[in-house]
Curated annotation (Swiss-Prot):
Residues 665-737 form the S1 motif domain. It is an enzyme of class 2 (transferase). Mg(2+) binds at D528, D534. This is Polyribonucleotide nucleotidyltransferase. It comes from Kocuria rhizophila (strain ATCC 9341 / DSM 348 / NBRC 103217 / DC2201). PROSITE patterns: KH_TYPE_1, S1. InterPro entries: ExoRNase_PH_dom1, ExoRNase_PH_dom2_sf, GPSI/PNP, KH_dom, KH_dom_type_1, KH_dom_type_1_sf, NA-bd_OB-fold, PNPase. HAMAP family: PNPase.
Amino acid sequence: MEGPEIQSAEAVIDNGSYGKRVVRFETGRLARQAAGSAMVYIDEETSMLSATAVGKHPREGFDFFPLTVDVEERMYAAGRIPGSFFRREGRPSTDAILTCRLIDRPLRPAFGKGLRNEVQVVVTVMSIAPDEIYNTVAINAASMSTTLSGMPFQGPVGGVRMALMAEENGGHQWIAFPKHSQLENAVFDMAVAGRVVTTKDGGQDVAIMMVEAEATDNAWELIKGQGAVAPSEELVAEGLEASKPFIKALCDAQADLAARNRKPELDLPRFGGFGDDAAQAVEQFVGERMAQVYSIAGKQEREAATDELHHDTLAELTGEGKPFEGRADEVNGAYQALTKQTVRQRILKDKVRIDGRGLTDIRQLSAEVDVLPRVHGSALFERGETQIMGVTTLNMLKMEQQIDSLSPVKHKRYIHHYNFPPYSTGETGRVGSPKRREIGHGALAERAITPVLPSREEFPYAIRQVSEALGSNGSTSMGSVCASTLALYNAGVPLRAPVAGIAMGLVSDTVDGEVQYAALTDILGAEDALGDMDFKVAGTREFVTAIQLDTKLDGIPASVLASALTQAREARLYILDVLTSAIDAPDEMSEFAPRVISVTVPVSKIGEVIGPKGKMINQIQEDTGTDISIEDDGTVYIGATDGPSAEAARSAINAIANPQVPEVGERYLGTVVKTTTFGAFVSLTPGKDGLLHISEMRQLNDDKRVNEVDDVLSVGQKVQVEITKVDDRGKLSLAPVVAGSDSDAASDDEN
């Protein structure tokens, strides 16, 4: 029996010295009863099946396009059995949900306007290499199956992950589809999606439709410790341009396969269109009322007025015996179009927005900390009618989130949860488990803060941040970033820098025969709905930490995007001033927060600390009222409700594993075991090292400033040192002891 005809096309992604990646599209073999299906491979190891199905009839009562995107992570793809009780995949992982949103955002605006037939895209991850990140590959898979389906679809859409790699001598390079291990040397990471469009001069360009970006976990260390380039607004714009050739290659491969295999375009009914007579009737009836309504500053008052105007328009034009009876859909479409035109023309011509602000004006800001009793950290951030409460909770590292998904990341200690109750917009609705939007907003705020978190060694706590959206009128996600900075500082978390976020918008229209653009700072909910772009930017004073961009336009001029980025930076710096005026450094930890300290024991002593069947460690926990966890490298974390209990547990552990604990003032002839840009690590005794900071090395260099540690000390060299400090985690700070120095003389005097 002759098998099915299988056809394929591929895109070669050339990253220069970083190697090549090959994305292959295949159709005709699997899921042949779906409207469109495709297998997509990257380097032949990671593969996924995408299938697009189309409903036969329009959904009644829907005034939007019913598109559903689902991502199925199969554990067999990684050679694993699910960890659930029934050993079967259950609800989607957070990674899968975020990938659904990543696919939906560029695909949805590419469908024909007015469609009401239900469309479902299901992407199933069939196999995955351990070091692979599959989410942007899934965008291409979903686009391929949809392009083949015959749906009215202005695709194909290409998706690519770009990483800003830090190179020697401060250089950098953007690479496509980085592997997870490569991100350790990257300072910025972004997913970009777009499609090929025809320019006015007949050429081709790539219209960017979606961006999801963040600074990496290692960005701070790479920038501050190794001199890597910081991800500025200019570099982000450079990365977007660098992504375009890769997106075009992916779109070209899809178009090649679609040209040979696409089904005839489906003839589906369209809704929401309207004739010229309906447009004229709506404009004549509404008159100046539309402009007056959209000049009301208050959200609730404006919404009440718009509801009344909308109701009056329908009653007057579509009621029984009225000229447009039975044509309510047309009148609705004309009304929405007039609303959009009224708002846009006022912004572009008069430079005045809905609430009377100028294009770059920020609404009134308010920042307050310590707003709830007993919690570990809390804050309230308000921007106009948007109100966010942030609450921080600290616990031991063993409470960090364990991740059971196909992601190479298996745990995380910083968790951001975002809640959006219906009362935040003055409405009723379901409450309970989070919806996809809440998960997406929480993930965006989490990515914005992650690059400035202290290391596990500096702050050995699991951190849960919750953002409660108590009032919503524009960018609660960026409000959550601001509230998180405040609450984390209030909880005593030593952030490396404060982070603020701002939501930008863009409107465009033809004015006097010319297309004009206007970037809006701090957009309202209505400006988001009626505009062309939603652009969220978060960052510190020095660099960008997270970006999310969605646009409805077929390409944004580079100058317009650069201007919007600069405008966003100015707004971010202003908001940071407000945040730091409320709190500019970590507070003392709450008395209700657990105290977590650490001690290092030799790996060979771990068994002695635990004892037979856990007898020893259980006895210490019972005697001291503490909670103890031991890492494989010998790091012991001790959690307690108060400091004395934690110290008692540490003393008990030291008595077993470190019977001789160094104290301040003790001197050792140590051996240099490692040099860094900021100092040298000196081994005092087996398993006990200390840091000799570069600022302490003057005495070893004739009291002259030391610029390079290696000019004074080298690995293996012996050096006489004195312990000057033992911090609460048992870390030692050292100073050199030189014959004839002040410290040596003082010691001789005491003797």
